[in-house]
A protein has these predicted regions:
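Active-site mouth of glycoside hydrolases
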Residues: 25-40, 45-237, 242-250
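Sec-dependent N-terminal signal peptides
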Residues: 3-12
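Short amphipathic alpha-helical segments that mediate assembly, nucleic-acid/protein binding
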Residues: 3, 65-69, 81, 369-373, ...
Length: 400
């Protein structure tokens, strides 16, 4: 009897330690490890581990990560391109960026990542994210890990680096690989309270009518991913986004995990109560926390109005993105590198391999291409970038 009592007390103590040390869902709100209500306020480290063409001002050119990588390979060769990308990932987000985010008054960063960095045998993803997590810990920031690009593609667009179709819902092998990667990540971070949770799939299933047939398959895929996470990690919150770019919560039944949070994204709509009403109603109906994982790409006035609306409704938020080229709609922006107009003009040709003679004639010189990407590595560093004070003020952040 004493032994049974001892084991029971040990189990209860362990559960209490997990709940006490980790931020978690508690009713319709998120709470910190001490049980105090926690409203997440932060930014997305977009364009770091998943590149998007518009954030490089590649109008009319490559938009997905693999298309951008192919362009760099074409212009400076595969060896120099591989070296460039390693240096890019080291330079785009540094300790100075994380320190700045904390000093501005934010408490959270969301890290969009490509699954390829976490496949067995490639440890670069863990090395890069571990470094940021350590900086975040020192600055008292929380980290959310976001699978922006899942095996097979969860969206079927440029943002998930897919083949233009959400094959994840058709392909069991892709689902299994996604589950295995989340299991690896959960095993790695299971005892790290700086990591607040796992955003399992970014913006699944677009609004295109032909693809909404996959809405009914989304929650079953989430169940597989949650099971994989829970096999290694009982501490962290799992985050589920709705269909149609994380906007449609009608695809969800009752919550199936006691430590879950639901996320929505909202862009380009009037910043009024009706914009968040469905999500607030979902929160109240199911007694679960909600989080606005992405919004932005708008004027400072709009950003300020929507941010206030979220705060008034006690909704956590992370605006998109933290940094991009020549833009006011981000906390930080960097200048266009030298020779970049030549790069943009070449990238917009879409010539492919069908007319290599014209492509070679149109391409910038190797010297100019190398100079452009070397200058890009300089421009993206925090010390060479520009802070957008108006955008920060709109987010209620501290401007120094």
């Amino acid at each position: 009897m004493r032994w049974i009592l001892f084991v029971l007390l040990l189990v209860l103590a362990h559960d209490g330690e997990a709940q006490g040390g980790f931020a978690h869902a508690e009713g319709k709100f998120f709470v910190d490890g001490a049980g105090h209500k926690l409203i997440l306020r932060g930014t997305n480290l977009g364009n770091w581990l998943v590149q998007e063409g518009y954030m490089f001002r590649l109008e009319g050119g490559p938009q997905s990560a693999r298309e951008i990588e192919a362009m760099v390979n074409e212009l400076i060769g595969p060896t120099d391109a591989a070296k460039f990308w390693h240096e890019y990932r080291d330079a785009y987000i540094t300790r100075k960026d994380i320190d700045f985010i904390a000093k501005a008054g934010f408490n959270t960063i969301r890290i969009p990542f490509h699954y390829k960095f976490f496949v067995p045998g490639d440890e670069e993803g863990f090395a890069l994210v571990d470094r940021v997590v350590e900086w975040a810990k020192a600055d008292h920031l929380y980290v959310i890990l976001d699978m922006h690009c899942a095996p097979g593609g969860q969206t079927g667009a440029n943002i998930d680096d897919s083949w233009g179709y959400p094959w994840l819902y058709e392909d069991e092998a892709s689902q299994q690989q996604a589950a295995e990667i989340w299991k690896r990540i959960a095993a790695h971070y299971h005892d790290n309270p700086t990591v607040v949770g796992y955003d399992l799939l970014n913006e699944p299933i677009p609004h295109y009518p032909k693809l909404q047939q996959y809405n009914s398959k989304l929650e079953p895929v989430y169940r597989k991913l949650v099971a994989a996470v829970r096999s290694e990690d009982k501490n962290h919150v799992v985050i589920l986004g709705g269909a149609q770019w994380d906007t449609n919560f009608s695809v969800f039944g009752a919550p199936f995990d006691k430590n879950a949070m639901y996320t929505f994204h909202k862009y380009w709509m009037p910043p009024v109560q009706d914009a968040v009403k469905p999500y607030v109603e979902f929160r109240d109906k199911y007694n679960v926390p909600i989080w606005m994982g992405e919004s932005g790409e708008n004027t400072d006035e709009w950003i300020g109005q929507f941010r206030k609306l979220l705060d008034d409704n006690e909704i956590s938020w992370t605006f998109w993105p933290y940094k991009k080229m020549e833009a006011k709609s981000a906390p930080v922006t960097f200048a266009r590198p030298e020779h970049w107009d030549e790069i943009v003009a070449y990238a917009a040709r879409h010539a492919g391999m069908g007319d290599t003679e014209k492509s070679v004639a149109a391409r910038p010189s190797l010297e100019d291409s190398r100079a452009a990407f070397e200058d890009l590595l300089r421009k993206i560093r925090f010390e060479n970038a520009t802070v957008n004070d108006g955008y920060l003020k709109a987010l209620g952040a501290t401007v120094k």
